[in-house]
Amino acid sequence: MRHPIDPKVDCVFKALLGAESNRDLLIHFLNAVLGADLTRPIVAVEIQNPYNEKEFLDDKLTVVDVKARDATGQMFQVEVQLLNHRDLPARILYGWANLYRSQIKEGESYRKLRPTYAIWLLGQTLLPDAPEYAHEFRLRDQHGRVFLDHGGIWLLELSKFAADAVETEQQRWLKFFNEAERLDEDALPGWMQTPEMRRAMNTLKAFSEKEHAYYAYQARQDFLREQQSIQLEFEDLRAEVEQARAAADEARAAQEQERAAKEQARAAEERERVAKEEALAENERLKRLLADKSESSGTGTP
């Protein structure tokens, strides 16, 4: 290829799995990711929002996920997200719920609802406390019982995937997304020697060889880099704000400790003053007693 192409850039991703000419690749990808959870393999899909090269070249490509329906009515959403943000989990859940809801109109029976699957490829780690790269979320109770087997959300964290050997088709796809940009099409490794991977490389080659497509790809990549820079600046600013807030909290805590210490000191001084007054009063009382005894002794009958 004339230029390296990253399949994770959203426009390439959309062409790879969302173009009508690559429908077989989408089917293969869906079976690779969901195969173990499907009652039967997917054999055909209808892409609901197919990739439109003209929209991409005119910089009007705004919907970059892939939505599809199979022959049984099951719904699928596939999306790549290179940058994390605070609201990403809510966006993922909303996207799944919105696609699930879109199956019926007002007044239609709930029986028309079919399982809906959302697959997200993530460029950055979203779940740092979990060592696994693949996560499956379904509607289950605390004992693991499924409330309704109507699909779910699959997250694939590419930053955690580091398998050297390919053992499953899912791993083959993830390795492709992670490494395809650095591969030499004239010396592809063994794990790339499948019809699906060669077709996927042909899609990347089309972006590399067509000058107008490559310039548009570069513009999209530059936009994503700018977004990443803005995100990093925002995170730095947020970290500074958090540090300032923590410093202010520490200062307030120190002031509170100082105030409490002063209160304790004043209380101690007050106790000491009261003790002194009580001691003086007791001393005066004893003096008076002695004086009274002395007077009684002096005036008494011999």
Can you name each region flagged by the protein language model?
Residues 1-209:
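Conserved single-residue anchors adjacent to enzymatic active/cofactor-binding motifs
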Residues 76-81, 175-302:
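Short, charged alpha-helical interaction segments and adjacent helix-coil junctions
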